[in-house]
Amino acid sequence: MASNQIYTPPAFTLPDLVEIQRASFRWFLEEGLIEELESFSPITDYTGKIELHFLAKDYRLKEPKYSVDEAKRRDATYSMQMYVPTRLINKENGNIIDQDVFIGDLPLMTDRGTFIINGAERVIVNQIVRSPGVYYKSETDKNGRRTYNASLIPNRGAWLKFETDKNDLLWVRIDKTRKLSAHVLLKALGLTDSEILERLRHPEYYQKTVEKEGKFSEEEALIELYKKLRPGEPPTVSGGQQLLESRFFDPKRYDLGRVGRYKLNRKLQLNIPDSVRILTPEDILAAIDYLINLEFDLGTIDDIDHLGNRRVRSVGELLQNQVRVGLNRLERIIRERMTVSDTDSLTPTSLVNPKPLVAAIKEFFGSSQLSQFMDQTNPLAELTHKRRLSALGPGGLTRERAGFAVRDIHPSHYGRICPIETPEGPNAGLIGSLATHARVNEYGFIETPFYPVKDGRVLKDQPPIYMTADEEDDKRVAPGDVPTDENGYILGDVVPVRYRQDFTTTTPDQVDYVAVSPVQIISVATSLIPFLEHDDANRALMGSNMQRQAVPLLRPQRPLVGTGLEAQAARDSGMVILSQTNGVVSYVDANQIRVKTDNGPEITYTLQKYQRSNQDTCLNQRPIVFVGDRVQAGQVIADGSATEGGELALGQNILVAYMPWEGYNYEDAILISERLVQEDVYTSIHIEKYEIEARQTKLGPEEITREVPNVSEEALRQLDENGIIRIGAFVEAGDILVGKVTPKGESDQPPEEKLLRAIFGEKARDVRDNSLRVPNGEKGRVVDVRVFTREQGDELPPGANMVVRVYVAQKRKIQVGDKMAGRHGNKGIISRILPVEDMPFLPDGRPVDIVLNPLGVPSRMNVGQVYECLLGWAGACLGRRFKITPFDEMHGKEKSRETVHAKLQEARDVTGQDWVFNPENPGKMVVYDGRTGEPFDRPVTVGMAYMLKLVHLVDDKIHARSTGPYSLVTQQPLGGKAQQGGQRFGEMEVWALEAYGAAYILQELLTVKSDDMQGRNEALNAIVKGQSIPRPGTPESFKVLMRELQSLCLDISVRKASIPSFDDDGEMKPDPEVDLMVDVSPRRTPARPTIDYSALDDTDDKEGATTF
């Protein structure tokens, strides 16, 4: 299958897919960090005599302490030390001290766009937030009168909101406080009435506000402003002045940001330079002018979900914000030290304490919502994670508050954010993925490329023009799949275009731009689905998401039917090794490749072998070149996990039949052939990490040793002399991986032992076995052991003397309960594995590999899978692979059907087998029952489908509990496999048993099997001794409920029903109270206090005796 049939060569090669991460971090190092340091320079003390300047332009970064691989091995952070030249000026005596100061460690991005924090690869997700700028909105009140408002949102600082009301008055709110007349604010800014009215297009509208407020001076306006913003404090003119200055005109407190200034200038047609990041009176006047014009139907209101009003904050900017937080804290410390210390002995090093900055950066990488543990299940998952856009996180939205509008697909998403790929569930629409050709510009807006069109001719020979959503709005843009002739002229009289957020049609000569590619609108994961245009969007969404969950298999196989993007996706994920130069391969083995370059030196490429990924899948690289091969720069020389020949290979091509089989594929279940198990078609390797540390305890150090008490020699035979398992040993659940003993405390010892110790001293010192064992349900082969000790100079957690890590690999064959899926959202669980001889077989005797339910197709509307399976069948018969770019109608109507039909006919002609394609039943063939050899009663669709095995493996989910831990308060068993929990018997299950009247089973479930503490101990005892199970007692949760009601002062008690009896006066005696709290088990709370009334009668001076 070496030759490739490519129908549509990609018209435009994709840009580097991880560039968004790298470019942003590069910007941070080159500009962002310098910008922040300079904004804090100089720092002066309170008297103004001492100044500390940061000479940020010359800052230095030291070589990282560890390489990337070494940092992963040692669980360290891959980072560099930052040094900034500083100058301390003492104005009293004119002394100047220059020094390089260490300001902290900065984690460094690897060339794959990730960070290594404490040995784990992490990704900083891009955040999509509302852009700073001015936004105009209209609202209709209950009388149908329309009012407008404008919000001036800065990057940081106070919000300013202007609004009109039904009486045509103008109001302003500062930071959502009380309303204030706009005239007061403008006067407080020092503008005269004539200046204000001259600047407005409709001064008569503003005049109403002036008349309502009356005439007043700037001083009166400032006092009024102060009263409104600081009610309760004595107002002063200087106070008002200072308040206004600090709120809007102090660059430290108020910052529009470069973007905010750019958006303001664009919206209000101002010419204020980019460097002015604070508000100016000009801005405020222009904003009010625009607001008044809206009342006269001039100008437009803004749509906050439009991508021209939302921008992307990538790593660099998020990190810059965090550095600002750290520098703010640092500035305070430096000021204090300047004041406290002796001025003569001051040096920059003694002033600058790197701790606050280090803490801020650590906090960001370690615990920010946007710093995520990288999804490393397969190369596609890794790539998608780096291109993710999240609306959540600090300064973003929250799941609960986000409405429908924010989540919805917006016309401006076209070519920028994928309309398909988003999670199902509460995050739907809040987390998206960057489209294939999209890029982020310097202001953080997403741009996408278009070819210009001149007089109906697409200029494909010119470089495409990148446009933001704002720039594109007033252009007529045709989609990427419009048909053109060989000269580039658009065919047809009517062309579908997008114009001003609307889908309309126009003539070819009216078109301004054409999209560069049909896959431009979707993300990388979605663009890997062939025949995407035949799938319902909901299923395409599942298909995109499930491709990211495919487990890398032992022998990857690239798809027979692909889309042509597989190679680029594999390349940019960083899993494959690319040659850096032209040259000749001089040496190859499993661990390294050496390439002799044309100009002399030899480059060695080291391969990753069987490394554990973040998701416990296996990372492994294999060479695909031979000695003597000539390689070009950028050529793939080694495959990674889930790639073959430099292309993404997430699953396997297998023979599938769409037919029911004995009900085993009811409700999306899947029936598979034993061949898939025997031939390791769907076998994957998983590597689990187990770790143990020997700590220093109060009673002495823990020891890693082979001398484990009360353990047979058999259990220790795989351990070396230090008590650590040998590499290559096969281990099962319960086996010791590392022997460890912990000193026992005095209290643990019986008296006779204490006596022995008193006589013989330390000799009889006792230890407890605390070894690391293989957990339940796990087994495998030990592939690596790493030992870290203080003596070797390793950095260990506090209190630990030694850390041992053991890596156990297991081969997992496919089995019943595993989840499989195709690329079209067709997912299912394996219900049965059938012997090969029982599987339905084709006329040439070939058994099918997998039987799917045909009812899974019509209602789900993912017909793409049928096209894929039939074209795959043609490809398998012809020995070819196909690349079909989605949206192929540009080559003619019904092109998918035509292509598949033609290829099937060709397959029949080439093979000479008529059954391969039957024109009477196109796409179907006679299939025989493997059990009887009889043909089934009707033809069946059979073909080659590309199926994935997903990471939801039954081995990781199956779980059983006999006895285990209980919750502290309710005493019920915990939940979940990790806690060794039980199965919840919820209210609906209880109803089911009630409906059947199964009283005793129900009673056991609610008492001895759950939280009747005494009863469950007795029941266990009875089972062990073979006696009958005693009567259950009261559940603990009922007692908790009683206690809670008592804590609300409700006197609730349980009484024993008895035969009514009367006292001497003929009154009925109360039923005797049963104290549920008196319990034989030791951990009991004290009994409830009761008041002894007889004691009160005897003595009047006692206030009230309480007996317990």
UniProtKB/Swiss-Prot annotation:
Instruction: List the residue ranges of the region (Disordered).
Output: 1081-1108
Q: Which Pfam families match?
A: RNA_pol_Rpb2_1, RNA_pol_Rpb2_2, RNA_pol_Rpb2_3, RNA_pol_Rpb2_45, RNA_pol_Rpb2_6, RNA_pol_Rpb2_7
Extract one GO BP annotation from the record: DNA-templated transcription
One of the record's GO cellular component terms = DNA-directed RNA polymerase complex
User: Which GO molecular function entries does the Swiss-Prot or TrEMBL record give?
Assistant: DNA binding; DNA-directed RNA polymerase activity; ribonucleoside binding
Task: Extract the InterPro entries matched here.
Answer: DNA-dir_RNA_pol_bsu_ext_1_sf, DNA-dir_RNA_pol_bsu_external_1, DNA-dir_RNA_pol_su2, DNA-dir_RNAP_su2_dom, DNA-dir_RNAP_su2_hyb_sf, RNA_pol_bsu_bac, RNA_pol_bsu_CS, RNA_pol_bsu_protrusion
Query: Which keywords does the record carry?
Result: DNA-directed RNA polymerase, Nucleotidyltransferase, Transcription, Transferase
| SUPFAM superfamilies from the UniProt entry | beta and beta-prime subunits of DNA dependent RNA-polymerase
Report the superkingdom from the record.
Bacteria
Provide the disulphide bond pattern: none
Q: Its Enzyme Commission number?
A: 2.7.7.6
**Which reaction does this chain catalyze?**
RNA(n) + a ribonucleoside 5'-triphosphate = RNA(n+1) + diphosphate
Q: What does this protein do?
A: DNA-dependent RNA polymerase catalyzes the transcription of DNA into RNA using the four ribonucleoside triphosphates as substrates.
Family, as annotated: Belongs to the RNA polymerase beta chain family.
> HAMAP family, alphabetically?
RNApol_bact_RpoB (MF_01321)
Quaternary structure? In cyanobacteria the RNAP catalytic core is composed of 2 alpha, 1 beta, 1 beta', 1 gamma and 1 omega subunit. When a sigma factor is associated with the core the holoenzyme is formed, which can initiate transcription.
Put simply, this protein is called DNA-directed RNA polymerase subunit beta
Q: Which organism is it from?
A: Thermosynechococcus vestitus (strain NIES-2133 / IAM M-273 / BP-1)
Provide the taxonomic classification.
Bacteria, Bacillati, Cyanobacteriota, Cyanophyceae, Acaryochloridales
